[in-house]
Amino acid sequence: MGFRIRESLLLNLRKVPGSRVKARETMVSVTMATSEWIQFFKEAGIPPGPAVNYAVMFVDNRIQKSMLLDLNKEIMNELGVTVVGDIIAILKHAKVVHRQDMCKAATASVPCTPSPLQGELRRGASSAASRMIANSLNHDSPPHTPARRSDNSTSKISVTVSNKVAVKNAKAAALAHREEESLVVPTKRRRVTAEMEGKYIIHMPKGTTPRTRKILEQQQAAKGLHRTSVFDRLGAETKADTTTGTKPTGVFSRLGATPEMDEELAWDSDNDSSSSSVLQYAGVLKKLGRGPTKASPQPALTVKAKATSSATTLASTPKLRRLALPSRPGPEKKPESLPKVSILKRLGKAAVVSEAQDSQVTSTKSPTVRCIVPDPPAPLASQRPPRRRWRRTCKDC
């Protein structure tokens, strides 16, 4: 393809002799462009044969270096690049070249600072010696090199300089990144202290200063007192015994009764039950050995009548009541228990009344004896009602 372009250009030059200069300029620019693109593709890693073909296609389609970022897969297929590996390599290398061009533009835009020697030469340019030196330097300067050689050398130098600048920039960026990582302060993990958890750590003085020694002596003196109980702190000499004994106590013992009194009460109840089961019903039973009786039969009353009538004496009916047990000394009176009734009383069987318990009635006229039979006690509400009792005739009456 390159040879064909050159042949066509030579034919055009022969036909039009006046345009030889323009043709030469275009031919130089084309060869420069193709050489640049060939170098570009070689740097991308493409073999020499396909690299020449791709360079001619880029030159024919007027692709410039500023259009590298606009290349994509579709455009590469239209340009005749169909190999997928070549497409990927060209696109990657296009990004690298674009970065290098940007770096060149940045370095060219930065103005170079003039050196102090150049400033001094400019200041002293008005002197004759400086003028002579400047003229000699201008005359001794080498002639200008041809255009082709200068262009090729500048292109090669620019590529090498751009590569060096890119490498330097990459190294500088890596160093800056490392410095940033080294300067980053490591974040400390949050430590939960004992105060946050609710525990307090008290650091006691070690006794290095006189003040701390005094504090430690006071603490040791306070520890030697051994007043630990509440009674000691309040000033009490002995503690009150709040513990109860292991011996079981009853209600009467807590009220003030003694075990001896309880035994006597139990003995009396046993005697009552045994006597009531053996003896017959004889009115009110009285225990003479257990204390004085409270009720006594009242004396007979004498009634004086008129002269015509005889004086009659009326005997008062004795009051019948059951005597309770003799009272014993104690802090409080015990509640009276219900009287125990014998079987004969519950059955309602009449008992023979002894002569000692009969009431006698005397009069001045004729002595008469009356027998008073007391009524049986009323049955308790909790007991069974008595059976029908049998009537007996009193032999004495």
UniProtKB/Swiss-Prot annotation:
Per UniProt, location of the Glycyl lysine isopeptide (Lys-Gly) (interchain with G-Cter in SUMO2) cross-link in this chain: K239
Classification via Gene3D superfamilies: Transcription Factor, Ets-1
Bias (Basic residues): 385-397
Sequence segments annotated as region (Disordered): 135-156, 289-316, 354-397
Sites of Phosphoserine modification: S115, S141, S269, S296, S342
TM region positions: none
Biased composition, class Low complexity, residue ranges: 300-316
Composition bias, Polar residues: 356-367
Keywords of this entry: Isopeptide bond, Phosphoprotein, Ubl conjugation
GO CC term (a single one): nucleus
Matches recorded under InterPro entries: C19orf47-like, C19orf47_SAM, DUF5577, SAM/pointed_sf
PANTHER family: DUF5577 DOMAIN-CONTAINING PROTEIN (PTHR21359:SF1)
Name this polypeptide is given: Uncharacterized protein C19orf47 homolog
UniProt source species: Rattus norvegicus (Rat)
